[in-house]
UniProtKB/Swiss-Prot annotation:
Gene3D superfamilies: NCX, central ion-binding region (1.20.1420.30). The chain crosses the membrane at residues 69-89, 97-116, 128-148, 162-182, 198-218, 239-259, 282-302, 326-346, 361-381, 385-405, 412-432. Residues 90-96, 149-161, 219-238, 303-325, 382-384, 433-463 are extracellular. Changing residue 412 to A: No effect on transport activity. Interacts with GRXS14 and CXIP4. CAX1 expression in tomato increases calcium content and prolonges shelf life and may serve as an alternative to the application of CaCl(2) used to extend shelf life in numerous agricultural commodities. Expression in potato tubers increases calcium content by 3-fold without the adverse effect of increasing other metal ion contents. The modification N-acetylalanine is found at residue 2. One of its GO terms (cellular component) is plant-type vacuole. Induction: By cold in leaves. Highly induced by Ca(2+) and at low levels by Na(+) and Ni(2+). This is Vacuolar cation/proton exchanger 1.
Amino acid sequence: MAGIVTEPWSVAENGNPSITAKGSSRELRLGRTAHNMSSSSLRKKSDLRVIQKVPYKGLKDFLSNLQEVILGTKLAILFPAIPAAIICTYCGVSQPWIFGLSLLGLTPLAERVSFLTEQLAFYTGPTLGGLLNATCGNATELIIAILALTNNKVAVVKYSLLGSILSNLLLVLGTSLFCGGIANIRREQRFDRKQADVNFFLLLLGFLCHLLPLLVGYLKNGEASAAVLSDMQLSISRGFSIVMLISYIAYLVFQLWTHRQLFDAQEQEDEYDDDVEQETAVISFWSGFAWLVGMTLVIALLSEYVVATIEEASDKWNLSVSFISIILLPIVGNAAEHAGAVIFAFKNKLDISLGVALGSATQIGLFVVPLTIIVAWILGINMDLNFGPLETGCLAVSIIITAFTLQDGSSHYMKGLVLLLCYFIIAICFFVDKLPQKQNAIHLGHQAMNNVVTATGGGVFSS
């Protein structure tokens, strides 16, 4: 690997490296995933002229880090929602307010995690950096799923993960194709089908793993008791989850090592690409690592608030838990990534937009979902891959219609419009789901915990 140095980790803060980071600029670009390319469109350059005049190096480094990490994004305006959610918790404010503020606070945090993993990739090299980016790409969804699981809210876990897949396949991709088609209405937008084909093969594998446990419950009904059927579905799901994780590991090897060229973001010589080419690390390795740990802890805190208040928000807003989990959580939680995908579609860079939507859907379907099943298994919680007939049907239709939409390697606004309309149809279906809260929480086959109390200072959540 070109440009490797033997000196220990160190770099002067804010883009003035004292040594050469691992990998050349070209190699570092290869280590970036579509998630990072998408999120980078929401970043803004920092003006550090005032900070550079601070005489004390420690204070100057801290202020520089603060400027780059907190204020270096166009979503910085949403950061006040984080302390607001915490204060509302201590003051005993209505839980729907805490739920809404926590969701808003998660939006910039998800984008900043992407920024920090990219900063670390400057030091780890393109391969390890790409692996880090791929692993942390959906950290918010994984944290919410695990916290909901520890509260025994299995339905919320299933709904939120399914919603993330549907959102990426229909909403994000549909909006990107529609906006890109309108912005480039006088010319045909084209993209490389190869990476899309790989993602669809894996998504179909994931769908098969969801379909078979569902069919077992129907085909074996009457031949065995409900308890036996439940055990069969649980055992099948755990076995399938191991297979899904193996397939995801193979996908990472395929993406980062053997066929990396298929997943490279398209490289056109324009102003944006020149900017990307000149990017350097703006914070040191250990500063980036510390910020990443801190951001992850804050995401975990806000995710706990979201999980603990979702039923109360459902009652107050007269919305079903299924609608909030499948529609609202993915839209707000991934707003930064979604906006970036649309921006690149406007720039006629559909390969990046596709990489965001399909890559994220694949990661959730083949990594986050089976990992959640394994974690539930370890915790002694019965969670399977049977998401229900309606939910599994929505997943199947979404994968099939998206595959047909992208089969010819070209795009126009009508394709995006159809995907968006499909998403609206699914949203309407879950919007009219008015099952009572307790039934809504258990209708996927698992009894929710009757009383989950989370005490954080003066704030107490009950569900």
